[in-house]
Regions:
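Short, charged/polar N-terminal "headpieces" of proteins
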Residues: 18-29
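Acidic, low-complexity, intrinsically disordered interaction modules
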Residues: 28-89
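Generic low-complexity, intrinsically disordered sequence content enriched
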Residues: 8-10, 22, 69, 78
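Short acidic DE-rich linear segments
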Residues: 4, 97-105
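Short acidic, low-complexity intrinsically disordered linear motifs used
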Residues: 1-18
C-alpha cells in the first residue's frame, strides 16, 4: 500500500525526528550552539549546530546532515534545507545562510 503525503507533512515528520534527538542547546551572546547531548557538551565533544545572530548564518555538522539524508532518502541539499527550517523554529532570529562541513575531510 502506498501513501501520498504533502511536502509539509513530510517536513513535519522530519521536524518530529529532530525534536526527538533532544539536542543540548545553549544560548550565548552571538546565537545558539547545539550538541548531540549534555554529556557530549560536558566532555568537549563536537558541536552539532551553531547559529550565529551577527552573521545570520548557521553551521550544521555533516554527521547530522548525512543522518537525516540517509534516514529520509533525501539529497544532501534537501536535508540541509529541512534541517535549516527546523532550526528556525528553535531560535529567536532569522538565518540567511546554512552550510555544512560535508566533504571537508
Amino acid at each position: 500500500m502506498k501513501y501520498l503525503i504533502t511536502e509539509s507533512q513530510f517536513d513535519n515528520i522530519i521536524f518530529k525526528y529532530l525534536d526527538m534527538q533532544n539536542f543540548y542547546k545553549m544560548r550565548y551572546d552571538k546565537g545558539y550552539v547545539f550538541w548531540e547531548s549534555k554529556e557530549v557538551w560536558e566532555s568537549g565533544g563536537n558541536i552539532t549546530i551553531t547559529a550565529n545572530r551577527e552573521r545570520s548564518e548557521c553551521f550544521v555538522n555533516s554527521d547530522l546532515l548525512v543522518e537525516v539524508a540517509s534516514i529520509f532518502s533525501l539529497e544532501l541539499n534537501d536535508s540541509l534545507n529541512v534541517i535549516g527550517a527546523w532550526i528556525k523554529t528553535q531560535i529567536d532570529f532569522d538565518i540567511a545562510e546554512f552550510f555544512s562541513d560535508y566533504g571537508a575531510d
